[in-house]
């Protein structure tokens, strides 16, 4: 059901009109353009192709198996890649049901709806997960098989609260809009607390040294899920493909990370938030 609607577009053309005219869509055609927040400059238009999105779905499915028996509860905004790609498109591709709720802020209502719907998969951020846990009754969340956190650091107290109160282990992942969005994720079999999991399949990475940081460096990645590029600010309609000193296709995440011997990634912070003090860089 729809509880809130700010606008509704009604087309005169039947759905089959759009289906017929999209049959010739090329795999590398633009599927969606999502804009970054602009927290470190101007917002950037991230161009993702159909191939990018489908590749990331295949990568994530190796860790989280979306299937037709699942019901996904998604209250995240669809103008963000976490809410759109992970919370909507991936479950749709898996054939499951999806319940979209307009706001993640209703801490009392959302757990009740999860119970009523029998939801099995839930996407949220640390902030919201902590809020739900303070209001939800233990039985409200007993249908959930997967609780997946992203978009911000998952705190230890949030993880412990969910485990002790509901017996649910939160799986933390890591992604960026430019990667459609998932780069790494923990799963039920391979899960290391404090990390964002291991790199998804078919991705390469290297750690770029940063002056003043001995343990860790910049994470640079490449794979079929990496964006086509950014919309050019200078040349209308053109796309600036990702590239580093190693060539085209490599994307510098801007995140300082440590990768352990088992391949689990720990995020130390954004590179631009590290200050050099006494010859060493420390997070601010």
Name each model-derived stretch.
Residues 54-71, 79-121, 135:
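Conserved AMP-binding/adenylation subdomain of ANL enzymes
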Residues 10-12, 153, 186-187, 191-235, ...:
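Adenylate-forming AMP-binding core of the ANL superfamily, especially NRPS adenylation
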Residues 31-55, 186:
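Conserved AMP-binding A3 loop
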Residues 13-14, 18, 46-67, 75, ...:
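Conserved structural elements of the adenylate-forming
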Residues 2-35, 42, 65-71:
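Conserved pre-ATP/AMP-binding loop-to-beta segment of ANL
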Residues 30, 36-39, 72, 78, ...:
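Conserved S/T- and glycine-rich ATP-binding loop of Class I adenylate-forming
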Residues 119-124, 133-191, 204-206:
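Gly/Ser/Thr-rich phosphate-binding loop
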Residues 220-284:
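Conserved ATP-binding/catalytic segment of the ANL
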């Amino acid at each position: 059901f729809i509880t809130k609607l700010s606008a509704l577009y009604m087309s005169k053309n039947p759905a089959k009109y759009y289906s017929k005219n999209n049959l010739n869509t090329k795999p590398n055609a633009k599927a969606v353009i999502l804009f970054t927040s602009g927290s470190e400059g101007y917002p950037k238009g991230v161009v993702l192709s159909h191939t990018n999105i489908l590749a990331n779905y295949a990568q994530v499915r190796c860790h989280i198996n979306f299937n037709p028996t699942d019901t996904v509860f998604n209250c995240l905004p669809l103008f963000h890649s976490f809410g759109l790609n992970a919370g909507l498109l991936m479950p749709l591709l898996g054939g499951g049901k999806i319940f979209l709720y307009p706001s993640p802020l209703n801490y009392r209502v959302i757990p009740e709806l999860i119970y009523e719907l029998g939801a099995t998969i839930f996407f949220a951020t640390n902030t919201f997960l902590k809020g739900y846990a303070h209001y939800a009754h233990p039985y409200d969340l007993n249908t959930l098989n997967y609780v997946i956190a992203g978009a911000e650091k998952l705190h230890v107290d949030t993880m412990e609260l969910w485990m002790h109160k509901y017996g649910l282990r939160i799986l933390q992942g890591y992604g960026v809009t430019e990667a459609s969005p998932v780069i790494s994720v923990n799963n039920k079999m391979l899960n290391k607390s404090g990390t964002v999991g291991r790199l998804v399949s078919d991705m390469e990475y290297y750690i770029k040294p940063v002056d003043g940081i001995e343990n860790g460096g910049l994470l640079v990645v490449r794979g079929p899920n990496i964006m086509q590029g950014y919309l050019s600010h200078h040349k209308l309609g053109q796309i600036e493909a990702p590239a580093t000193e190693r060539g085209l296709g490599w994307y510098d995440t801007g995140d300082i990370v440590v990768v352990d011997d088992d391949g689990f990634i720990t995020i130390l912070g954004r590179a631009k938030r590290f200050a050099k003090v006494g010859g060493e860089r420390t997070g601010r």
